[in-house]
Amino acid sequence: MSQVVKVGQIEIRYLVDGAQTGGLGVFEMKLPAGAHVPPPHSHTDNEECVYVLEGVLRYSVDDETRDLKPGDWMSTPRGSVHHFSNAGTETVRALVMLTPDIGVQFFRDCDRGLGVMGEEG
């Protein structure tokens, strides 16, 4: 059964847990129009690949930025700085694959951190 977590403006629906696949995690991400999240970041231990299903996702890896349309994909090697946004007028839906998986609990913890920051700020 899939698990849904909201992290700020991002909705994440976990489809495949890495514990079931020897390390590969897969989730569907929904990003509303106008969303510019997350800030630039990197994963030292994880490879990431995004495949767009609907909408146009602006995806940046290091110094390369592309507007990904349905059927387009882009990969993020370990240690590469990346971020994404939805500058369009419709919700973006994309599949995100991580290896090794960081797990749904990582996103729950991120969501709790955002809630705490919002309450204090």
Enumerate the language-model features and the residues they cover.
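Short acidic-glycine-tyrosine-enriched beta hairpin
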Residues: 63-81
